[in-house]
Amino acid sequence: MTENYGSMEHRKKSFRNNENLEQQFHPLREELDNAGPINDRTSELSLEGVSKAEAIASTWSKRSIIVAYLGLYLLSFASSLEQQTTYSLQRYATSNFSAHSNLATINLVGNILLAVVRAPMVKAADVFGRSESLSLALGMTVLGYLSLAFSRNIQMFTVAYILYICGQTGLGLLSQLIIADTSSLLNRGILSAIPELPYLATVWIGPVLAQAFHPEKNYGWRLGYGIWAFILPTVSLPLLASLFLNQRKAKAAGLYREHHNLINHSTPEKLRLFYLFWQELDGLGIVLFVSGFTLLLLPFSHSSQVVSPDSTILTLFTITLSIALLVTLCFYDVKYARYPVFALKSLKDRTILGSCVLIFTYFMSYYIFSNFLTSFLQVSYGLSIDMSSLTLNVFVFSMTTTAILSGFLMKRFGRFKMLLMISVPMYVLGILGIILFGINDNHYTRPLVLVLILAGMGGGLLTLSAQIAVQSVSSHAKLGMNLTLYLTFSSVGGAFGSAIAGGVWSKRLSSRLLHDLKDHLPVPEIESIFRDLRTALSYPQGTQIRNIINVAYTATEKDLFHISLVASLFMFAGLVIIRDVPLSTENHDTAVETPSE
């Protein structure tokens, strides 16, 4: 075993010879004491959790860590295949409930919950352990699959989707935390790409698998969701077994003690610990965040509703209230929250601020054009379910490939900003190319595929480089909070993008269809074309009705790309702010090298 991990026997004796366990993690204790204001400190529970993670990391052998990383890859492969499959099913599930235009609203709510669930997941991982939190996330995901499969209306489907998103987010976040626990900063760019590797294959397999389920039929899309409730728990067993075994090994060696194990405490103490945990989750902050952003974004995503004086007043009141709630959130979290849900003070660091601005605008731009892209391809271009998804997935494939490449480039040159300086112009040029060449009257897919590849390459270089930028200025104790803040900005950006997409799609597509088809079809049939993708596809290509539908879909999707281009220009603001921090194994004061026997 390497010197980085230290001798197990030496650690065992050291822990036994000291009555106070926390003395073994003096750097973390010193950081806590010198943190300054109380709401900028690392909590006692989190401090103990980080100490526990480091103690467990010291027990990894070469064999056990290989098993863990293989298990991590297997879980990532199954998760990515599921995502690529169910993405195509989603628009048919909503169409089954006559709510195809609600796609953006569902993604909007999902992105808001994405931003919120990360903080509790990180806190749970710090307090209770990586293994326990991974099991919780897995359980939520499985329950989400089953709820989606058996949903009876769009409301039940949305609630089930939220549960599913929470679980999937937990799995992804905990995978990154496990990698961070067992790697140095210099190697983390490469290792962080492990969960992304499966996308190189699943982007091609998923759409074909989705087509095989026949999602246009009611039972087809339900089966496509439900089957994963059995697959995912099975493939997660190697990773979970490896984590629990090494946790047991560390505890048996006396490398840590669980001061906050609820089983060993009386009822009053359990209640006190539950209150402490709730306080650390910043429950009030979460309520303010969810209510504020939901009230702000939902009116925009439903802009197709009939405008009346009453609805206008209600919308203005809703937006005003949401802004007040968000201002209150910022003031409360900065001034009064003992352990704020979002580490807003970290934004004082220009590298973290710039990375957050960059990832916010990137995800906003992406979600603006991507929400309805495959629907547009199926209608206007006449592509099948699998071919439309495969066309979009060339973006995902190129993004994943360049993200992996960026890890090796950061390892080779020890820099991340040069990659950001290349990625942002590349992505913007890709979006511009889609507008100029990708969407054409001849419905050729080759130009669209080429410019999607260019945009995806820019996105891949950007996402991982910006994430490493945040980690490069974060200590181990602050890593989870700062990473959560960064990912929150990505989710909020996605929520804004979905809100804009939903509003533009609902308002402009519905008005175009009504204006162009009112002399050919009754209003209820026009509404059905708008709400149900299957109705739009039921009209044969080449007929007058289908041509009108195609023109309306094309014009609306092109509008979304124009807005996406404008949003992407703001990425340059974040790029300018970020410092060029050199990467090395010393950046991270508690980084741990991969062990070897």
Curated annotation (Swiss-Prot):
PROSITE patterns hit by this protein: MFS
Subcellular location: Membrane
Chief localisation class: membrane
InterPro entries with a match to the protein in the record: MFS (IPR011701), MFS_dom (IPR020846), MFS_trans_sf (IPR036259)
Keywords: Ion transport, Iron, Iron transport, Membrane, Phosphoprotein, Transmembrane, Transmembrane helix, Transport
A cellular component annotation (GO) from this entry: fungal-type vacuole membrane
Chain positions with Phosphoserine modification: S46
Domain of life: Eukaryota
Molecular-function GO terms, alphabetical: siderophore-iron transmembrane transporter activity
Membrane topology, as annotated: Multi-pass membrane protein
Listed GO biological process terms: transmembrane transport
Chain segments annotated as transmembrane: 65-85, 97-117, 131-151, 159-179, 190-210, 225-245, 281-301, 312-332, 357-377, 390-410, 419-439, 448-468, 485-505, 558-578
PANTHER family, sorted: MAJOR FACILITATOR SUPERFAMILY, SIDEROPHORE IRON TRANSPORTER 2
Family affiliation: Belongs to the major facilitator superfamily.
Function field: Involved in the transport of siderophore iron and so has a role in iron homeostasis.
This protein's name: Siderophore iron transporter 2
Gene: str2
